[in-house]
Amino acid sequence: MTLQISIDELLRYSSEERDKWRQWLVTHPAAMESPVQPAGGFPTIGKLIDHIFIVERRHLQRLQGQPLSSATGLTGNNVPPLFDYGASVRRELEQYLRELGDEEADEVRQFNVRDRMWPMTPRKLLFHILLHELRHWAQVALAVRLAGFDPPGDHDLFYSHALQ
């Protein structure tokens, strides 16, 4: 038996999570400063969300053969502009997906990441973008709980309307 999830289903699930977190963080803006990795690259929830969105931008730029952005240009502590940036990148990703043909999606290409060439298909990189984001939303949920907040519920795919 073959069970599968489509990129469209995973994209819808990811978008549901973004919307849920955006709505919650607008009403709990102090949570943006909650610690994630105090001595690491993502010291706060806001900085981790900024990372989610810039990584999506950079991987999309890789797929399109464009120069890579170095940063979002945002502080990572103001919910509306940060999520607006993420929504803008997501619209571009959705447009890329609409234009991507099946053959092109499965053609192995070389992607330069961290000064190393990685052979992979655009299909793999697209799934990675979404799985990368979903893993980080789980980290956000844990950080929110550890900071004493009650996060928005029903994050599991089980509760999602993205697929039946």
Locate the predicted segments by residue:
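Short, contiguous pre-domain boundary segments
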Residues: 1-3
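Solvent-exposed, well-ordered amphipathic alpha-helical segments
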Residues: 5, 15-18, 56, 84-93
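Short, contiguous alpha-helical
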Residues: 8-25, 30-72, 114-164
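Helix-adjacent hinge/juxtasegments
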Residues: 65-105
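A mid-sequence interfacial segment
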Residues: 91-127
